Curated annotation (Swiss-Prot):
Family: Belongs to the chaperonin (HSP60) family.
GO MF terms held by the record: ATP binding; ATP-dependent protein folding chaperone; isomerase activity; unfolded protein binding
Catalysis: reaction(s): ATP + H2O + a folded polypeptide = ADP + phosphate + an unfolded polypeptide
Name recorded for this polypeptide: Chaperonin GroEL
PROSITE patterns recorded: CHAPERONINS_CPN60
GO biological process per UniProt: protein refolding
Pfam (any one): Cpn60_TCP1
Record gene name: groEL
Functional summary from the UniProt entry: Together with its co-chaperonin GroES, plays an essential role in assisting protein folding. The GroEL-GroES system forms a nano-cage that allows encapsulation of the non-native substrate proteins and provides a physical environment optimized to promote and accelerate protein folding.
Amino acid sequence: MAKNIQFDIEARDKLKKGVDALANAVKVTLGPKGRNVVLQKSFGGPQVTKDGVSVAKEIELEDPIENLGAQMVKEVASKTNDIAGDGTTTATVLAQAIVREGLKNVAAGANPMDLKRGIDKAVEAVVNDLKKQSREVGGSNEKIKQVASISANNDEAIGELISVAFDKVGKEGVITVEEAKGIETTVDVVEGMQFDRGYQSPYFVTNSDKMITEFDNPYILLSDKKISSMKDLLPILEPVAQSGKPLLIISEEVEGEALATLVVNKIRGALKVAAVKAPGFGDRRKAMLEDIAILTGGTVISEETGSKLEDTKLSFLGKAERVTIDKDNTTIVNGNGKKSDIESRVNQIKAQIEKTTSDYDKEKLQERLAKLAGGVAVLYVGAASEVEMKEKKDRVDDALHATRAAVEEGIVAGGGVALVRAIKSLNGLKVDNVDQDTGIKIVKRSLQEPLRQIVANAGEEGSVIVAKVAEGKNEFGYDAKLGEYKNMISEGIIDPTKVTRVALENAASVSGMLLTTECVITEIKKEEPAMPQMPNSGMGGMM
């Protein structure tokens, strides 16, 4: 296929048009008074969003070179979203500003490579300054609520729910977002370890009203094999029956004679017992059984470790304060495991998370970590219509990611103030030539842009407010929601440090690539000739 090759100013101008087209659509969403964007979907109703990356992902331009520019900035938004989970609009605004200022200087004869070196030096200095400005969130529920509220577009109800969820499950816990059946948005917390396997027979139910099995202080037998013969279980069932405590059997499966005998004994009242299948599959099943063993202070009966069911003693069994089983899930609360063993297992899983490259494996390891270290909270998002539901769910997801980022790296003053304060760190930065110094000045100017855009979206004059905020010190900034100057941190207008840092790093990285582009090669689309009309296709004259 033939190619279209464009060089120099023509190529860069078209790339800039693409950057501007995407950035202008995204940046209307920035700040407390940012507007919504409505996206047409190929199926279903339209999607209404204030999420920068959702807008960016929808944009495809007709001109291939302009489209390349748009795709490069789309990469900024997507990468920021992947790493920090929020800050996509800020990253897009920064990228547009660096490209705009940079291309002006390239057109005026500056060396693009030196401009890029200057930009990179400036970004490094700003990131170090952001780290100095950063404050730890610690266990402060109020700070978590503020971060979540701002990221959910100043929705305090969502902020409150997320802070409750974090309070219950801790920073290692898993918080998932589901669609609610009604219009209420609620949080549901599962204490202890829950896995998605229910009782193997409804005859094990102890509470027939709720159709659940409830055990207090049960013994827990863990095995990685199928149990089909009763003689394997007899040696352990006798001492358990004498102790008067219930028994939960977690194995690959209890079947045949063994299951029938357990059910009969349960119905007669001779034994309080229930059997559930082990969670997961293959190697993951073995790992999860080991997790349960560590949590409950038991031992997995496995031929791999040389232990057999018929040799099982009471000391091999785990214990827990309470176990609840329904037809789909089993929950173990307050296992009897040693704290030191659980901590070393948690550290082992954390190390595996660091090493793994697969997103799926990472997600599964994260779930295991949560079940061991904290718990699981589910946020049920309710709304009156499906369109509102999707929009709200997006905001809750953003808020959740932002909160995790804040817990991880701390917080800085929000509303674009932290970036404005970081400008001073660029004064007197050592450079090798004038063009590198110009690169630093480009970043200085660009750091004001998020604040300028927040103010513009609120209908105010950006330059005046940027100048006044720049004159101030520390956390002094502009609250665009109320139109007042305030201390941003004490007013709860805060951003996660990680989000601000990642937004700037990604914006500078992609902008640098774009500024140093000298040639663009695209495909020339052939015009497909129209299909010739078949004779008599109008059926005219036919009887």
